[in-house]
């Protein structure tokens, strides 16, 4: 089943005025006349207040679902588009407050409601889920790809919908909602058909796309006997997760003209296909002093020195504000061995301290990625956009499953006994009463000490996610480190000169495609840029609550005065109050500007911002006592080697001076003899003394 709700603002709180439900069966056509609808103003004869009528809309929707479940004698899944952050919040509160006979089991992590299961006793009757978790994207775009025959998504003037004109606008409002429900039904039906046809997998058996991708990988491409994926314990996960930094986003030059914007074709899938992966069971090494870095493969805590001569440093580092920067200086961090080796080749000093070592193994993902990428190309060539879309999202979703963090925020709706237990025995964030004997509680999971409390998500293997992202940074660095690189964001670069033809292709995995030719562009901060493409198109991106207040002129003004800030009004139309489970509209004032110097330091020429320099740091605070002793010992070794090197250099210099003096003396004697002895034999008259290097001098036996 698929469903939708429509809301109106009453005292800045969203209240449902309409709801609809459509039964979708495999192989059967769907029509809008099959949609059950519930409209608040239809109850105006029996209910005076809108609050009561709004409650009745959801009450009858739930009642209809319960009736279908009893008639069909089957458990049903009902999908909403954006259930996690909108419809699901409305339903969770409604069920907790108005359906006391039901037991609710919400699956909520990090303030995202993935599933809301409804029980009668111990029997699950139905469950609500978010279609976005399986099919990410706007409903209009999904429908265009998967079910174009059902027509386009409609629109309504939300700002014109008021309590006073709800009744008069009934037809247009219900038509809009019914079209959304019809499109969602078509999208889910087509997706279910495709996945069943290709893989014999029912999408209803998985909540998220990454889980679905993992299931298909395991079923069709994975050989567990030859490549068992190790699930880390708490100590392993906590250590290796420090090496899971993600993508690299930075702005280097704030303004440029006549530029080239490139994207890599499926960067992470390419890395998963071509690069080795950490396999086997990790082995802990508490002291790697004196060990050869080249012989290691795994995740290492290392003491690192990046010279100030490196303009665009390679190794990431999280500062005290949890900002990911790429600094010069002296610091300690946990890194994938391959990026430490790469950094050393760039001129970094790398001293391994401790870490988990794995087996270096060929990637288990090669067949999975190759098959999906080739199938996607074939689908695009044949014009089958629906299949091409499915192959693309599957290929790009597997990696994220391995990086799921076991430490998360869990939200429960529970009775008073459970509420009191969580207050006493969990790392509580908040707890509030929703209704009699119904409480909402949020707490942190997997934060207790001891292995008995460790309950990570199934198939969480952070070593794979960390290796993939680190290898991607290695792959991108030759392009990022170019002098003409203006901006980078994980799998893209903006360059002043074109890339060579041999690395360009729109259809080869891992090669670059020209996304845009940029006439002029402003790159003021990570994920905050504006450029005019060569065809005149304006492309603008800004990350932050005030993004609707940002225009091309703002980028021009901000570039002229980077420190400029202004207070702007911002409407947050769908803010969730987790204490009350209300979705509210909130108007706030936000200071709009860019944060200078948090990732790189701006460089000015005659008061014009022209470039950036890396931040220089010194931070050894993460070292424990053993680590400090190891670093002290390694530093002493380095100092000793430097001293020995200086002594040898001085000896070499002394020998070279002696050779030079000896050469000068011999030449002087020879010249004097030549001038005084006119009867020199012919053989000697051709003799020349040539200068010699110290090494030649030693070889000659002087």
Predicted regions and their residues:
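Eukaryotic intrinsically disordered, low-complexity regulatory regions enriched for S/T, P, E, and Q
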Residues: 678-702
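Heptad-repeat coiled-coil/leucine-zipper oligomerization helices
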Residues: 630, 637, 644, 651, ...
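Conserved acidic
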Residues: 10-641, 645-647
